[in-house]
């Protein structure tokens, strides 16, 4: 089988590529240049597409004895991931850029090019498993990335491989060391790759500019002014610009955002719970949509809590009724569905949260 191994320069993708070589496949390594800034440098465990990352990926490819190329996807990454990220925050939403990158870049643009060039599969270092064409959680639950892959279609998954999904992270590092790969102890990447400073609010402010509005409570009392709704997300407690707690002595949280009026609403923690969600643009990883209401497990953050819910597809929207409330649910988040069984590791599908109610 002809395999294109996506190599970021990190330990996970390096071991994934090595395993595909060991399996006897015809492997070619490729590094995706996603930054429009020439010579971008890594800042500790933050940043992406740095000169160090390219060099590390190339050295691993040399050790493995496979061809290696750098493909420039910077313009498409800017349009499909960064610009969408900024636009979503300007609308008062809370998107996950890793979800968008997987859906639009790694398993769309990259996969399409790979198939056009005659490759059968794109292998990545994601912590997830494929079994019988079904996407499942990784063995290492602490590193599981099935959440950010749940937007992939059955067709996309047919041409994907996740060689390290059955392995614990510490075992991956140990294997890299045994293979003599210099990335064995390289720090994991954290945060949003295109915001190496880690300051999302500053990044968004630079992109969007100042759009002043008010922070108000449930009674409509103005508590503070702000420079843009992009600096807030539902569930946020710090950085609200409010002095002191609420009149009941309890902390205040962002409970809702109205981008049209530039209003940020705050309230008690009790105001954060929601029981009903509506998701748009649903994707079902196994291909077929569920027939009628189905009980499953839902998750709204990459490593967040889960909850049992009854889900039903009505038209082109996903209606979700939670058995227990979830807190801090925001528009724009990815809602992922898992099969309700003892393992709870099979992904059924996903949608983008369009609205929610208590």
From Swiss-Prot:
It holds the Pfam family tRNA_Me_trans. Keywords: ATP-binding, Cytoplasm, Disulfide bond, Nucleotide-binding, RNA-binding, Transferase, tRNA processing, tRNA-binding. It is an enzyme of class 2 (transferase). Its EC number is 2.8.1.13. CDD domains: MnmA_TRMU-like. InterPro entries: MnmA-like, MnmA-like_C, MnmA-like_central, MnmA-like_central_sf, Rossmann-like_a/b/a_fold. It is found in: Cytoplasm. The record marks 126, 333 as: Interaction with tRNA. The keyword Zinc does not apply. One of its GO terms (molecular function) is tRNA binding. Belongs to the MnmA/TRMU family. Catalyzes the 2-thiolation of uridine at the wobble position (U34) of tRNA, leading to the formation of s(2)U34. PANTHER family: MITOCHONDRIAL TRNA-SPECIFIC 2-THIOURIDYLASE 1, TRNA 5-METHYLAMINOMETHYL-2-THIOURIDYLATE -METHYLTRANSFERASE. This is tRNA-specific 2-thiouridylase MnmA.
